[in-house]
Amino acid sequence: MNEDTPPFYFISVCDNFRDNTAEHVFDMLIERHSSFENYPIENTAFINSLIVNGFKYNQVDDHVVCEYCEAEIKNWSEDECIEYAHVTLSPYCAYANKIAERESFGDNITINAVLVKEGKPKCVYRCMSNLQSRMDTFVNFWPAALRDMITNIAEAGLFYTGRGDETVCFFCDCCVRDWHTNEDTWQRHAAENPQCYFVLSVKGKEFCQNSITVTHVDKRDDDNLNENADDIEEKYECKVCLERQRDAVLMPCRHFCVCVQCYFGLDQKCPTCRQDVTDFIKIFVV
């Protein structure tokens, strides 16, 4: 393939991915470009498109790996719609979703590529994974008329950018703006990105797809709750926030001690045993 460095238009495609400076993005593109030296498909335009879409060659057949979500994909055809294949085969990839926002996919697109290794959803802004960190971003410039919504917006995984009423998800990087008083913040987030791993983990797939009606019950307004129900609620309250019910079993230690929302704010250590946490299983207490 061509030895030249990637054309500069790559930067304009990628520099809005907020977690990287333009200089760092360019360095990543150069590194990805170099990895395709011995790629079996010699179509330069196709290779450039793979690079733009976050892929590097892993030196096995025609397998490529996304630098952001680590999904591994093979069996490409030169007429493949790479953007569509990436976001379809790895729907949690924040980078693939950001590029797909700019695309208009037609109907009946055929995907020839095959997923070898599933991608892992990655948090874009780890520093904002803690609820209080997100709350703190609303201190300055947030519109006074929307001040009562700050807690709900932050709990839905969003932090304030300092511009108008623009908020961004700490996990998937989607942008939510033009808020109205008393809006359902979770529904707005899910509407912007129904594939957000944080929203899916907390609210469930059905909620994100708007296929069922979700009813929120506030126990403070429910006069029918008895003392026994209150005892159960206290028994299973999250050990971190002391407010929500536990619904996450931490892996691999299997301690049942936090809610899913607080799981995303952990320092990757179980609060009970301090063992490294690699994943969680969501459960429902009935």
Swiss-Prot record:
It comes from Autographa californica nuclear polyhedrosis virus (AcMNPV). A zinc finger (RING-type) spans 238-274. One of its GO terms (biological process) is symbiont-mediated perturbation of host apoptosis. Keywords: Apoptosis, Host-virus interaction, Metal-binding, Modulation of host cell apoptosis by virus, Repeat, Zinc, Zinc-finger. This is Apoptosis inhibitor 1. BIR repeats lie at residues 29-96, 131-199. GO terms for molecular function: zinc ion binding. The keyword Repeat applies. It holds the Pfam family zf-C3HC4_3. PROSITE patterns: BIR_REPEAT_1 (PS01282), BIR_REPEAT_2 (PS50143), ZF_RING_2 (PS50089). Acts by blocking cellular apoptosis early in infection. Later, stimulates caspase-3-like protease activity and induces apoptosis, probably to favor the release of occluded virions. InterPro entries: BIR_rpt, IAP, Znf_RING, Znf_RING/FYVE/PHD. Coiled coil: none annotated. Zn(2+) binds at residues 169, 172, 189, 196. It comes from the Viruses.
